[in-house]
Amino acid sequence: VLSAADKANVKGVFSKIGGHADDYGAETLERMFIAYPQTKTYFPHFDLHHGSAQIKAHGKKVAAALVEAVNHIDDITGALSKLSDLHAQKLRVDPVNFKFLGHCFLVVVAIHHPAALTPEVHASLDKFMCAVGAVLTAKYR
């Protein structure tokens, strides 16, 4: 459960990300594909090279989903319901991959905003990414 402080920390980080969200989404995917190569199996039709148009396009979708979750931080479940259906029923992505994505996103934030990622903010952002992952895997049962 995200506390009021967690929600404020997450919103603060996303305000710093601002117009870079799409780029950070793509960078997160690139990192995930390198660090966790098994995640590539869900993207057999993608050009997975650095800077590819497909990674940029999907990174934009990832970023949009995260921004949507932040914008509806009191109802992440409602905000990501359709995306949860898609991942559970059609794409059938292994739930562990959302943890990988969350970790890679934290790394990207740390690289671009090291001063903003205090231990408290890091913990809040990690809790937020876990909450997003939980919502995206809730309909797998």
From Swiss-Prot:
One of its GO terms (biological process) is hydrogen peroxide catabolic process. GO terms for cellular component: blood microparticle; haptoglobin-hemoglobin complex; hemoglobin complex. O2 binds at residue 58. One of its GO terms (molecular function) is oxygen carrier activity. Coiled coil: none annotated. SUPFAM superfamilies: Globin-like (SSF46458). Keywords: Heme, Iron, Metal-binding, Oxygen transport, Transport. Red blood cells. CDD domains: Hb-alpha-like (cd08927). Residues 1-141 form the Globin domain. Heterotetramer of two alpha chains and two beta chains. Belongs to the globin family. Involved in oxygen transport from the lung to the various peripheral tissues. This is Hemoglobin subunit alpha-A. It comes from Chloephaga melanoptera (Andean goose). The lineage of its organism: Eukaryota, Metazoa, Chordata, Craniata, Vertebrata.
